[in-house]
Amino acid sequence: MASHATGDGSIPSRDANKKGLKRIMTVGGAYGTRNYTVKDLRDQKGKKTLTETVPFSIEEAAAAEEAGIDTMKVRFDPKNPELAIAIRNAAPNTFMAFSCPLIAAATKDEAVKLGYKAMEIGADAVMTQWSPEFIEAATKAGIPVQGHAGLVPRRSTWTGGLKAVGKNLDEAIWIYNQIKIFENAGAYAVEVEVIPEDLLIEITKRTSLL
């Protein structure tokens, strides 16, 4: 399988280390180079503020890599993966989490298959709105998973619509418990949307998740 970095399937040169890149092999079997691995990101927790963007085109992805953006989140449509593949190839050295559609997996086995499909085409991790059971199944299969807490748009009916959450004690405790459940399920990170900054500061002190 061709390398995302070299294009010819060969192991990247050791000189990659001099450029601050890590030599890797993807779950799909492609050699490549990345600015970060999951281990690197976890090692940075509490030490460095990283930048992330969501590119919607190959031009945006290439520009983000050139600008030194640390990580990218890429929308992944398993029925039409061509754009995700093109974005991966446009920014071959940047750590990418592919965002998997919630309704694309109805069982734990389907979640694992979907995660593998994303990893096969070059994802370094998957970002999901899955239940803890699905996350646990995927992580046990070796797939790095990022959960989703706080305001989860596709589940917003449970939190009163598209609005901030965590502004009272009950909601704050609920968010914290949700994040700890994801942590126990094996996730390495969690996206937390539209919650008070002070709450997030306190929660991050109490979890290993990024």
Predicted regions span which residues?
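Alpha/beta enzyme core
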Residues: A2-L209
